[in-house]
Amino acid sequence: GFTSPAPRDYVGSKPLVAPEAIAIYNFTRLHNFRLILAYHTQGKEIYWQFQNYATQEAEQIGEIFAQVSGYALSEVPYNSSFAGYKDWFLQEYRRPGYTIEAGLGENPLPISQFNDIYNDNIGILVLGAVL
């Protein structure tokens, strides 16, 4: 899935080609977000850094998110960087941004994980609105 459209891992032929990427880009430009959360599934991890653009505050907030969710606060694997919403937001705005890898297992995750994912992430969603 790295070189052609697929259910996962394909980042596109260039930035801002996919309609959903354009929509998120435009929506972000219209708002003055203090922080952003980008949700993916697979891993029970929180990625917070991108090429040293993240601030110390971003790590501190990430630690709070990790504590309330039980997810690990992690560095993004190098081969997974450079194409995500969080990466762009950190570079463009120098504000906290996070990719939340919800759930555990291989995509697509089973619907049976829904309640666990919800319970793990409700604290992140509430705190993300007020921190």
At which residue positions do the language-model features occur?
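His/Asp/Glu-rich mid-to-C-terminal helical/loop segments that flank catalytic regions of hydrolases
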Residues: L109-L131
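Active-site/substrate-binding loop(s) of hydrolase catalytic cores
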Residues: G1-T55, E63, T99-L109
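Short Gly/Pro-enriched loop/turn and capping motifs at secondary-structure junctions
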Residues: G43-K44, Y71, S81-D87, L104-N107
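Sec-exported extracytoplasmic/periplasmic mature domains
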Residues: R29-F33, G70, V126-V130
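Short, flexible loop segments at boundaries between secondary-structure elements
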Residues: I64-P77
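Extracytoplasmic/secreted proteins, especially bacterial periplasmic and envelope-associated proteins
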Residues: P19, A23-N26, Q56-I64, S80, ...
